Amino acid sequence: MAAVWRWFVPERPSFYDRGLLALTFSLMGIGLMMVASASIKEGPGGDMFYFTKRHLIFLFVCLGIGVGTLYLPLERWREWSGRLLVGALGLLFAVLAVGRTVNGAKRWIGFGFFNIQPAELAKLALIVFIASYLVRRSDEVRGNIAGFVKPLAVVFLLAIMLLAQPDLGSVVVLFVCTFGLLFIGGAKLVQFIAIIVAGLSALAGLIIYEPYRLRRVTSFLDPWADPFGSGYQLTQSLMAFGRGGFFGQGLGNSVQKLSYLPEAHTDFVFAILGEELGYFGVLVVLFLQLLLAMKALQIGRTALLRSKFFEGYMACGIGIWFSFQTVVNVGAAAGMLPTKGLTLPLVSYGGSSLIAITMAVAILLRIDFERRLDTSHVIQREAA
């Protein structure tokens, strides 16, 4: 216990947020454990640990990319914000041109062993771009409708490419992050009301237009009306939670993962966690996810108070992204929201999601590091 206490409360000031690092590694560890358990019947060729080995490789790749991101000065992100967005648009276009189709959706670009899902990288690229835009055009955003609409035009362009895949879940994430950042940036409330009404109308139209989306919504409202058809996945997920009780069936003892619950190691890994670790495990993971999002928002608030607006907007955008995606994934697994195909941050299987989220965490660590470094320099100057 003493060693743990010294880790979180070091005797000498630390130049990085140990709590954020501990949260990240804890969620990664839980994710590896649950992917190993949930995917044990899914591997091709009879390899029970196929997805576990791939997930472990993804984690090592993520750590390498995270370290590289940590060494990148934040000013570079600001300088490259436009190029990152153009790169994300290029990758989304490439998906439509040469992407792989899985379960009726064309969302991945195949590179042999590894498939890239550009939608995950587009989320981070958009947050960086919007943060840069708010710094460059802060008066315009606060003063007139044009400054509010311009970033939304960028999101609409991304949304068109994502809907062609189709990937409505990522579109919703992009709009929520953009609205959140515009609100923090000082946009007028009346502008939000008008755009939100228009957005909800468009969302309803998209749901009605595509039969599979309409089936998802109707099955979410009453999954037991068609438990072996459109409501099958959700009813199996609810049964997993029901079997888990308070303390679960024990790690590895899930029944629903045995070919009953589709996508058990990706979109519905939270349901398997509930079955094996019970509501106790569910609360632990939700608490860790809440702390992760709060850490991001706290880092953002501190940066904004110190007039580090680009860094503050980026951190707040990342916090909104993490929290909203967690709510949607958990809500879909628990039958409170329609399924959207979004991962549970740092827990679900998926290399592109892990890479994007690890890069985002590394950016948070870098923001906090530069803040601590500035504070240290101020103290040294005052002492001199």
From Swiss-Prot:
Entry annotated with the keyword Ribosomal protein: no
Pathway listed: Cell wall biogenesis; peptidoglycan biosynthesis
One record GO biological process: FtsZ-dependent cytokinesis
Transmembrane segments: 20-40, 55-75, 84-104, 111-131, 144-164, 167-187, 189-209, 268-288, 317-337, 344-364
Subcellular location: Cell inner membrane
UniProtKB keywords: Cell cycle, Cell division, Cell inner membrane, Cell membrane, Cell shape, Cell wall biogenesis/degradation, Glycosyltransferase, Membrane, Peptidoglycan synthesis, Transferase, Transmembrane, Transmembrane helix
This enzyme's EC code(s): 2.4.99.28
Topological category with respect to the lipid bilayer: Multi-pass membrane protein
Topological domain ranges for the Periplasmic compartment: 41-54, 105-110, 165-166, 210-267, 338-343
Domain of life: Bacteria
A Gene Ontology molecular function term of the record: lipid-linked peptidoglycan transporter activity
Catalysed conversion reaction: [GlcNAc-(1->4)-Mur2Ac(oyl-L-Ala-gamma-D-Glu-L-Lys-D-Ala-D-Ala)](n)-di-trans,octa-cis-undecaprenyl diphosphate + beta-D-GlcNAc-(1->4)-Mur2Ac(oyl-L-Ala-gamma-D-Glu-L-Lys-D-Ala-D-Ala)-di-trans,octa-cis-undecaprenyl diphosphate = [GlcNAc-(1->4)-Mur2Ac(oyl-L-Ala-gamma-D-Glu-L-Lys-D-Ala-D-Ala)](n+1)-di-trans,octa-cis-undecaprenyl diphosphate + di-trans,octa-cis-undecaprenyl diphosphate + H(+)
Keyword DNA damage: no
Sequence ranges on the Cytoplasmic membrane side: 1-19, 76-83, 132-143, 188, 289-316, 365-384
A GO cellular component entry from the record: cell division site
Family indicated by similarity: Belongs to the SEDS family. FtsW subfamily.
Chain's role: Peptidoglycan polymerase that is essential for cell division.
NCBIfam families, per the entry: ftsW (TIGR02614), PRK10774.1 (NF008042)
Name of the molecule in the record: Probable peptidoglycan glycosyltransferase FtsW
Organism: Tolumonas auensis (strain DSM 9187 / NBRC 110442 / TA 4)
Gene: ftsW
